[in-house]
Amino acid sequence: MHASLASYAAAAMPALDLRPEIAHAHQPVMSPSHHGWDGNGATAVPTPMPKRLDGKVAIVTGGARGIGEAIVRLFAKHGARVVIADIDDAAGEALASALGPQVSFVRCDVSVEDDVRRAVDWALSRHGGRLDVYCNNAGVLGRQTRAARSILSFDAAEFDRVLRVNALGAALGMKHAARAMAPRRAGSIVSVASVAAVLGGLGPHAYTASKHAIVGLTKNAACELRAHGVRVNCVSPFGVATPMLINAWRQGHDDATADADRDLDLDLDVTVPSDQEVEKMEEVVRGLATLKGPTLRPRDIAEAVLFLASDEARYISGHNLVVDGGVTTSRNLIGL
């Protein structure tokens, strides 16, 4: 197994879901305990579970595709009115249209404070001055040439760009979400970080620094906002096979043909990989995983975000929920 391929697979935040396991937003949520036998020898009739975000208002940045799309769909399925905040107009509007009137789209570049402010204000005006959940999901990986990956030769402008999107974007989201939530003395802010914020050597320097920043911001903001009844948490996922990840690996291992000026971070720029490439990357991820059996998919990360966003986590704040099958616990990443 190639060490660099393994590093990308372990740490990179995915941009697109190639094989979605995402239920439609309007599909009823069924209780697993009500499937099969009812204990009296008869087959029980499935009954809907309570929707965990029923009536709540949520903003999901980077919600047009990938993990963000999985979060949007799951939030809507659980009764939330969801605002997709993304730079991909076509994908965002298409997703909102597909999910119905409870989901809407607003264009938002999270590295621009005016955009973040407008997105929050737009959600408040649309939903009666209410914002219950803000999910900082938008992020970029950064350029993946050999020079860009080295501490000896990285480009300062590119480093700054990645931190502006990933770290500043999360901070601005927390700032304006808290502005809306604090007066109501309630709310949940959930950010998507990475296992690269837990173990060193798993990702590019700018990306790793930005994800550490998200964990630090989460803890600091949780300390400040607890007095206002606002919870702040983050989720750090393991690798998921996505076009962004696969394209980054291609660029990083073909410096002879790589265009150092090409952005491979944004969903709009990636080339959809073949099924064989997806299977290869998923094989790499499964090989690195210490929990054998399931393959981590965007839906798994969305479920973790849903938990932290919901009242089921009402006394959890300042926490980094690592979704990695125990990799960072055992630190058993052979080949990295």
UniProtKB/Swiss-Prot annotation:
CDD domains: secoisolariciresinol-DH_like_SDR_c (cd05326). Required for stage-specific floral organ abortion. It comes from Zea mays. GO terms for molecular function: oxidoreductase activity, acting on the CH-OH group of donors, NAD or NADP as acceptor. It comes from the Eukaryota. Belongs to the short-chain dehydrogenases/reductases (SDR) family. InterPro entries: ABA2-like, NAD(P)-bd_dom_sf, SDR_fam. Substrate binds at S194. The gene is TS2. This is Sex determination protein tasselseed-2. Keywords: Developmental protein, Oxidoreductase. The active site is at Y207 (proton acceptor). NAD(+) binds at residues 59-83. Pfam families: adh_short, adh_short_C2. The lineage of its organism: Eukaryota, Viridiplantae, Streptophyta, Embryophyta, Tracheophyta. Signal peptide: none annotated.
